[in-house]
Structures are given as structure tokens and as C-alpha cells.
């Protein structure tokens, strides 16, 4: 129940298009972790701004690249751009695009 409550408090959901506020790239969320699930080494090396580990973190397919990023919630904003996401792995995680611009998740990863 605690994990469900923590995910319920996440600001974004799988299939939602977001923009990274620091690095200004678009992407689509494919999974949500209620708290940081990476290693200490990764956090110390990559998460230079030291975002909180006790808030949601998101797995994001980066638009027009073949990258997948792991991003703290505080670095994401909902994206107002309504254009579709282009990513080679999009169809492995997400289905049809909905009328509201989000994508239908094919399955829940967590």
C-alpha cells in the first residue's frame, strides 16, 4: 500500500510528454519509481544537482534520439508541444497516442 500511495503522489504518469527543465529536451515517460532506485555511484557521478532521492524519479525516452534517461521529478515539466515523440523504442513501451496527446502504456513496468 505504501508504494501505491507514493506512486499516487507522482506528478507525471507513463505516456505523458515532458520537457527536461535543465537540459531542455522533450521526452515521454515510460516508467515511474516512487523514490530513487539507482546506485550511489550513478547518483554521485550523474546527478550533479543532487535532486532528492525520496521523491519520484522517471524513465524517459528522449525525443529524436535513441537515449533513455532517468530523471528526478523536480527537473521535469509538462510539455505544451503537441507534436508526437520520435524514438526507436517507443512502440516497445507505449501504444496509440490519445486525443489529449499522451500515449497509452502497453504495460506497467513497476
PLM region spans:
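Short, glycine/acidic-enriched capping/hinge loops at junctions between secondary-structure elements
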Residues: 30-31, 40
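Intrinsically disordered, low-complexity boundary segments flanking structured domains
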Residues: 16, 44-49
